Amino acid sequence: PIGYNQSIVYIKSKNPLTGDDRRFRYDTVPKCYGLMASEELEETGILKVRRSPQLGYRGSGTLIGIIDTGIRLEESLFLYEDGSSKVVSLWDQSDQSGIRPEGFLYGTEWTREEISEGIKKKDKKLPGDENGHGTFLAAVAAGREDIDKGFSGIAPDAELVVVKLKQSKKYLREFYSIPDGIWSCQEDDVMLAVRYVISVANKLGRPVSICLGIGTNLGGHNGANGLARYISYLSLLPKISFHIAGGNEGISGHHFHGIIRREEQYQTVDFNVAEGENGFIMELWGDEPNVYTVGILSPGGENIERMQLKMGEFRSIRFFPENTLLEIRSFPGATIGGSQVIRMNFKNLVPGIWKLFIYGTGNGEK
């Protein structure tokens, strides 16, 4: 248990996770998250607020939690004049060689004193940031002022609690068709990272703002998944706030929203598969009490007519001559916030325009 009606369970299994795996409900398999940083800082207006002499908000006495790819601790933006670090505590989930944080089962914890000493000695064991995404977010949030370079973080006097997330496990990367070389973390590690940051803030007796610059295409975006529920509970507590990426994929074409009206038989969604795309998962979320079914047309012209899937039913379909495999499963809405979900897992995809036909039945229009 990690609190607030949320628990994480680890199960040792030799069997890979598949689309037909009936051991787990939809909402019990961790989702994978990717990086979502945006550099449009001036557009938020936050720098003007921070610069206002009447307000003078600089973050003194507060903490900012960075849960991301890590941080380049040796950067001057994160060091005081005496060489000590602005990072009061760091949990490296990817390193199993050191002392774990109290109450956690993996990773290595670094205190401010250990970090500062490691920087002075140029200790190669210090956690880093191979990607740079977490360092960027930390600099924007709490980087110290550099007058010569004209730079300042939003809250330059705030201090940092950092979690370097470990990357998603192999079985999840395979299940979600995440290519090699693409950074990805998993939902349960993020939830534990949030718990860690808050535990540090509580020990120090300081308010904390937690920055999550990660996101996922999966889920209903309705606040019903594990991480969203956990954040919703915690955000009601005093001295805890969250800053979360949203809207970063507004023009990327990864989402579709539609209404099937009573006079319509179905709606068509075109999705373009690029060269080199080996596979992906697509989800259809529908509002109850309506029931939704789908059909699919491949670029080669093979038409899979309307599939009447029962709740919980799984089907495996092979497209010829493309040799694409589609694993499709319908999930009942009772377990995931009142929405029907149809999950489509495409493997060995061929490029071109695919068509998804969405049928709705019921008294409503959505």
List PLM regions with ranges:
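Glycine-rich, phosphate-binding/catalytic loops in enzymes
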Residues: Y80-K86, A228, I260-R262
